[in-house]
C-alpha cells in the first residue's frame, strides 16, 4: 500500500519519506508500544521540516493512523488515513499468539513475534502494554483539537472487521473539510488477506467483501489520495 501510494505521489511531484519505527525493520529492538511510535513520528516530521519540507501530508494505515493523529506534527497540512483503527476492538489473542507466547506475556510481561513481512527484521517484541494500546484505541483522543482536514479511506473488508463502524462513531469529530471515502479492495487481496490481528473474519465474510467491492465500481486508493492531496497541499512550482 505504501509503495504504490508513494509512487503515485512522487509522479505527481511530491517528495515522500518512509521510515522504520522503533522495534520495526532496521531500527533498534524496542518493545512496540504507542508512545515511542508517536515520538518517532514527531521526530521524522521534525527532521523533514528542518530539511525545508514544511508542508506535510501524513499517511497512516490501520493502527498507524492513530499514531499519526496523536503525533500531531506542526507541519501536517492534512492526513490520509487508510483503514484506520479509530476505536476499541475486541480481540481473541488465542487466535494470534501461541501458548508459549501467551505464557511469556503472562509471566514475563513481553514476548517475541516472528516478522513475516519483507522486512530485514526476523522478529519484534511486544508487551502487555502493546495489547492494551491495540485494544483500547480512542478515536476521541486521537481527533481532539485537530484542525486540519482528514481523508479516511475504507474498503469492503473494513465492514467485516468493524473498522468502518469505528469511523462512523467518530465521524462527527472530524474537522471541517474532512472526507470518508470507500475504495476498491486491492488487487490480489483474496489470496493474501489477513484481517486486523485477532479480529476473526470467516471465509464467507471475505467472499462478501470481495463481491461488494467488485459490484460497487469503487475508485482505487491511489487515485482518491492523489486527488485529495492536490486539493489541500498543492505542489509548489
Where are these regions (language model features)?
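Alpha/beta-hydrolase active-site loop
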Residues: 31-51
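The alpha/beta-hydrolase serine catalytic core
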Residues: 75-235
